[in-house]
C-alpha cells in the first residue's frame, strides 16, 4: 500500500524525534572561531573529510587571519599548507579568488544572506547554508551526500528512486516539512547518522534506531522480519 503524504510526514517527525534522542547535541564537525574561518573550512572540505580539514586549518588561519591576507598570499605557500587535503592547487586558486572577492566587495566581512554568499566564487548553496546556520544562527539546511542518501533511504523525499537527485529540490522539500529553527540541527543529525550508521555501501541496519519504520531496512542474514 502506497504511503500517503500525511502518513509520510508523521513518520518523518517520529523518526526525527528518535534521531534527536540518539544525537542530542549535534554540532558542526569543522573547527572555526569566526565566519571567515568556517567559510574557508567549508570550501576546503570538498572531496575530503572534515577531520582532515581540521588538521590543516589551524596553520592556515594563523598565517592568513583576514580575507585580505589570504587574497595577497603566495599561492605556493597556501598549497604547502593544504597539500594533505588533495586537489591543493585548485583549492588554493579557489581560496585566493574567494578571499579577493570577499575583500573587494564586502570589505573582508562574510555576508549574512544566501544571495550574497552564493555570489562569491566557489560558494554554492551547501556552503552558504553551512555558514548561515553555524556562523550566524540563521536557518539553513546543507544538503551533502549523507543527507541525500539518508533522506532517500528513509523515503523522506519524493524523488528517492533517483540516481542523481537535485540537492536544491531536496532542500526545499525537506525544509517544507520542518520548522526553520530545526533545519541546521536536522542536517547535522542526518549527516552524523549517515556517517555512524546509514553507511553508503553497507548500512548498519542491525543497529539502526530507525529500523522499525525505515522503508529500506534490510534485516541481517538469517534474521526474519
Model regions: which residues?
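Catalytic cores of DNA base-excision repair glycosylases
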Residues: 2-223
